[in-house]
Amino acid sequence: MSHGGPCRPGRDLLVLTSNIGRLSRSLQQKPKSGSDQAGRHLSALLRQYPGHPYKKWQGAHWRLLSLVELGVVRADPTMIRALNQVLDWLLDPARPVSRIAGRYRMHASQEGNALLVCCRLGLGGDPRVSELASRLAEWQWSDGGWNCDPRPEVTHSSFHESLAPLRGLVAQGTFSDAATRAADFFLRHRLYRSESGDLVIDREWLRLHWPAYWH
């Protein structure tokens, strides 16, 4: 969600949180008939779509993340099936691990989002979930973040690739050192500024968004 025109934090935040909160409360209940708006949202997010779990925006990865960000905290059988699809994909032994110039160049936001979803839905004790957290800690760069850029000359972590792992590690709770280092990465940038020049990295980041995706 992006607002056009000048940013008005107070008004925008009130409208944004009100709308999200209303939908979140509705999503905690099973839709009665599917005719109400919340029921249609829930039905759409729980529907099984063909294709890869990461397919934008119908894949299980994205639908589960939306449900969790809307406040759903209990996984029904449909959500469990979708979670298993995501975990099977991420933990597939044949999935390549990219390491270039001494740094892991992985799309760590994928594991980070999955870790957050699993922990919010009560699957934090699943060994597969622990493996996701362990991999994120192993792939973390020395500056505290992550980056999927394959170019050897890139040595600075990406904001986009680092926020999801931070959220997931905080939710999982057993890799506090990695989570602290990731938090420090964002704090050094004062959340949205260049570490080297103190400039705003992207002025779009000064606007309120939901969902907080970069696409």
Language model regions located:
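Preference for long, amphipathic alpha-helical scaffolds in soluble/luminal domains
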Residues: M1-H215
